[in-house]
């Protein structure tokens, strides 16, 4: 009897796939898992944040206005008296709108006027909402301004600002566990309330704003002017009117069409209310 070693196949324990391909597949799998976990945490964190009583949110925030420092300096030579008059006017109009919007008990919008040139408005934590001079001076009527304020009050009523913070904090916690540094992400939380919300939240705020404007003025004329103005501002900057799929806000054309449809139900001679306090162009 004789013994001999059989030839060993060279392909044993050798993958036919390159090491680079295996590495890329592993990275892709990890990225998908992180993305799914982030999405779940964002939704869950936002849902849980909405359960925080508004009184608790208000007491924790106090007089701080999150996101105000992100708007830029604006005109440093602005007239303080003019600023105070406009802010008081915004507060008066916000209070009138809040009275017809069935706000939760204890929720009262607090309006602020920012000396920033960029046309913008947003709601933030604690019932605060901000309107910039760049937006205010472009408003052709009080009706248009009321739509802006009512839209932001609609976000406050739905607790969208605290939901955005809750979702962002949950994702930041995940990133901190993975990267070991969550402190660098904390300053970004305030920015979340200025970046917009989901398209569903925006449509809900649009509906609330239209209902409030109609309740206050008896018609929705002038509402469509808001989105025309925003579209004109973005046009020269090259931002255009992108598809709603790639934007947190519904496309301006779609929003203008909805506002025009609502305004069409009003009498042709329904008057627009002029702004009660004019703004210098600066």
State each model region's role.
Residues 2-282:
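A Zn2+-metalloprotease active-site environment signal
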């Amino acid at each position: 009897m004789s013994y001999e070693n059989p030839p060993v196949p060279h392909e044993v324990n050798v993958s036919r796939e390159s090491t680079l391909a295996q590495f890329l597949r592993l990275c892709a799998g990890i990225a998908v898992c992180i993305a799914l976990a982030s999405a779940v945490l964002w939704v869950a964190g936002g849902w849980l944040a909405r359960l925080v009583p508004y009184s608790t949110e208000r007491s924790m925030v106090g007089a701080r206005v999150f996101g105000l420092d992100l708007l830029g300096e604006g005109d440093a030579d602005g007239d303080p008296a003019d600023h105070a008059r406009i802010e008081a006017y915004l507060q008066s109009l916000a209070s009138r709108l809040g009275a017809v919007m069935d706000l939760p008990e204890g929720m009262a919008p607090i309006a602020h006027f920012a000396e920033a040139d960029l046309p913008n408005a947003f709601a933030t934590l604690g019932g605060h909402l901000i309107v910039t001079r760049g937006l205010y001076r472009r408003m052709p009527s009080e009706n248009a301004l009321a739509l802006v304020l009512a839209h932001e009050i609609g976000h406050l009523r739905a607790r969208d600002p605290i939901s955005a913070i809750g979702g962002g904090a949950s994702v930041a916690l995940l990133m901190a566990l993975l990267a070991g540094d969550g402190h660098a992400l904390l300053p970004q939380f305030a920015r979340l309330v200025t970046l917009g919300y989901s398209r569903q939240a925006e449509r809900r705020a649009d509906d609330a704003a239209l209902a409030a404007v109609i309740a206050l003025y008896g018609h929705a004329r002038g509402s469509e002017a808001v989105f025309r103005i925003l579209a004109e501002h973005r046009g020269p900057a090259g931002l255009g009117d992108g598809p709603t799929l790639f934007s947190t806000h519904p496309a301006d054309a779609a929003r203008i069409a909805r506002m025009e449809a609502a305004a069409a139900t009003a009498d042709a001679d329904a008057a627009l209310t002029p702004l009660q306090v004019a703004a210098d162009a600066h």
